[in-house]
């Protein structure tokens, strides 16, 4: 009887880490073990890096290439909601007549998790600095990306912006 209790306790102690391992992010820009990166997760990570690169180049059209060009796209930035790619595009074009005002984004951390073979969840933490001031804006974004014939595209996202 005592042996059975010891075995039960050992099993309970060993099982939670196995469950936790399956729920880990496949890509984390601060990885504990980079050898576990999966190809699709890496593709999503690279899409996000390309998006940030285009922002820093002040290339709005290039930045928006990673979003699904569809009226079904949903983007929420704080309390402002954009329905469809065209509305998002127009908002960026009109909101940044001086592209330098976009500032420069620096990713702090990017995590990617495949939910299905063609669906991924990404979390990013970032800061934006502005050349005209010494202020820095910080925030985070949650994005759902779907795999299409032409690659991974953001189909929904939510961004929260912190103080400056």
Can you say where each PLM-predicted feature lies in the sequence?
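A short gly/proline-enriched turn/hairpin at secondary-structure junctions
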Residues: 72-83, 97-100
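Sec-dependent N-terminal signal peptides
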Residues: 5-14
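Short beta-strand edge/turn micro-motifs at domain boundaries
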Residues: 21-29, 138-164
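Surface-exposed, charged secondary-structure patches
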Residues: 87-131
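A mature extracytoplasmic/lumenal domain signature
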Residues: 68, 79, 111, 124-126, ...
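Hydrophobic pocket/interface hotspot
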Residues: 51, 63-64, 72-73, 88, ...
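Sec/Tat signal peptide C-region and signal peptidase I cleavage site
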Residues: 16-20
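Short, low-complexity N-terminal intrinsically disordered segments enriched in polar/charged residues
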Residues: 21-66
């Amino acid at each position: 009887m005592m042996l059975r209790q010891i075995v039960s306790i050992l099993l309970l102690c060993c099982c939670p880490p196995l469950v936790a391992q399956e729920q880990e992010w496949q890509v984390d820009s601060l990885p504990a073990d980079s050898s576990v990166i999966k190809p699709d997760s890496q593709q999503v990570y690279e899409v996000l890096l390309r998006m940030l690169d285009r922002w820093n180049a002040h290339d709005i059209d290039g930045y928006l290439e990673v979003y699904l060009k569809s009226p079904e796209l949903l983007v929420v930035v704080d309390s402002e909601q954009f329905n469809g790619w065209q509305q998002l595009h127009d908002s960026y074009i009109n909101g940044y007549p001086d592209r330098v005002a976009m500032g420069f984004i620096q990713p702090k951390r990017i995590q990617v998790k495949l939910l299905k073979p063609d669906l991924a969840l990404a979390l990013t933490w970032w800061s934006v600095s502005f050349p005209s001031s010494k202020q820095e804006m910080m925030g985070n974004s949650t994005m759902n990306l779907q795999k299409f014939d032409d690659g991974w595209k953001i189909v929904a996202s939510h961004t929260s912006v912190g103080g400056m």
